[in-house]
Regions:
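Bacterial N-terminal signal peptides
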Residues: 1-7
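A sequence-level/structural motif corresponding to short, flexible coil/turn segments enriched
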Residues: 13-420
Length: 420
């Protein structure tokens, strides 16, 4: 039996700078099943929004009964750890979520995969309300024309070949399902990230090629449910994992590639890549490749101030890396942490998962160190989350602080709220 442990920390012990600050924490545990998972986190102005996948009954004494084998779940929590509402979306078949984002209008977007294009059923549990079942009968079954500081995507591998439809659910801030759109895909793949725009969203994803490799795509989706053309990047060895919408309406996309892109060939074993892309035609306007001899590098997160986070791996060294770039592609500053298996960021906060003791982070194996950084990348205030095996997501929100979603060593999922 898995558990979702929600740990909200008003103040955290400083892990990367002094003075130390300590305070009690509040903890709430929500029962789940063995295969339940959290795939990402975002927020509105007042609440944290968590997306995941569930099987069987959920939420203990207030069950959201299963709709199919696997269903998508969206759940909201306030800063005290209270579950404000939960929404379960699915069909009689399997439906899984792969990415989440919240736009400037506080509408929640959840991308995923489904076995069919049929209309979903929604089971909702608002705070202090009885569970009800609602069918979105006003929706069409399919659409014919087929963060800024949120890091939320978790990949689903291996991709099941029977999940043939990419789906996007649109939910309001009170947990009401507004729309659900579906688009058939010819190749196995999934959405890795959602970038909110002014008139809809951009889907960033991958497709599995016949050779078993990965190529990436960007595709627009209007608020009316119209899917735009897919623009592809790479042929069989390019993976895009995150991105942001820039002030000039271009997209910054990050990930990794082991093939030539925009006439720039791979220099290491696998290069970390930063692409500046025109969303109207998919043209690569700029490309920055981060590489090293024999190194496998990958960027996992990006922020609007051109700060990126990821990893670098060689035969002898694994590192977590956080860097900020200029608009011309030069490195303004970079922080490297030996013995780290993951590093993600937003525009002001970093989360690093360590697999061994690290003197710079003052951490030990299994710690997720979270810190707020200054304009030079140096830590200002930090905290640590022990006994962790994975960083699922990172979100900062004015008025709420920072929330980190992690997977613990016992298999549970933990949300930790910090005061910066």
């Amino acid at each position: 039996m898995a558990a979702f442990s929600l740990i909200f920390v008003p103040n955290a012990e400083a892990a990367t700078c002094s003075p130390k600050v300590a305070a009690p924490f509040l903890s709430t545990t929500i029962s789940g099943n063995q295969n339940d998972e959290i795939i990402g986190i975002s927020s509105t102005k007042k609440i944290w929004i968590v997306a995941g996948n569930v099987v069987g009954d959920f939420l203990g004494t207030t069950p959201l009964n299963p709709l199919g084998g696997v269903d998508s779940l969206v759940s909201a929590f306030d800063s005290s750890g209270v579950n404000v509402w939960s929404l379960r979306v699915g069909t009689s078949e399997d439906d899984v979520a792969t990415a989440i984002a919240v736009d400037s209008k506080e509408q929640i977007w959840i991308a995923g995969l489904a076995q069919s294009e049929k209309n979903p059923t929604a089971v909702t549990t608002p705070e202090s309300a009885t569970s009800t079942v609602q069918t979105q009968s006003s929706q069409t079954s399919t659409v014919q024309t087929f963060n800024p500081d949120s890091v939320t995507a978790q990949t689903v591998k291996p991709v099941r070949k029977d999940l043939k439809f990419i789906t996007v659910a649109q939910v309001d801030k009170n947990g009401l399902l507004i729309n659900r759109f579906a688009n058939a895909t010819n190749n196995s793949g999934y959405v890795t990230a959602i970038i909110p725009g002014s008139t809809g969203i951009f889907l960033i994803g991958i497709e599995i090629t016949k050779s078993g490799g990965e190529r990436s795509f960007v595709q627009s989706l209007s608020s009316a449910g119209e899917f735009g053309s897919k623009f592809y990047f790479g042929k069989s060895a390019t993976t895009l994992t995150s991105g942001v919408l820039n002030k000039d309406k271009t997209l910054t996309l990050v990930g990794n590639s082991a093939e030539t892109l925009a006439n720039k060939s791979v220099a290491g074993k696998v290069d970390g890549i930063i692409l500046n892309v025109s969303p109207s035609d998919g043209k690569i306007l700029k490309i920055v490749r981060s590489n090293g001899v024999g190194a496998t590098r990958s960027w996992k997160s990006a922020a609007g101030n051109l700060t990126v986070g990821g990893t670098s791996k060689t035969k002898s060294l694994n590192e977590g890396v956080i860097s900020q770039f200029s608009t011309t592609g030069s490195v303004l500053w970079s922080k490297r942490y030996a013995g780290a298996s993951a590093a993600i960021n937003n525009s002001a906060v970093v989360a690093v998962l360590t697999t061994q003791s690290n003197s710079l982070l003052k951490s030990k194996a299994g710690d997720v160190v979270v810190y707020q950084f200054d304009k030079k990348g140096d830590p200002k205030l930090g905290g640590r989350i022990p006994l962790s095996t994975e960083i699922v997501g990172l979100r900062s929100q004015s008025g709420l602080g920072t929330c980190v979603a992690t997977k613990a060593s016992d298999g549970s999922f933990v949300l930790t709220q910090l005061p910066f």
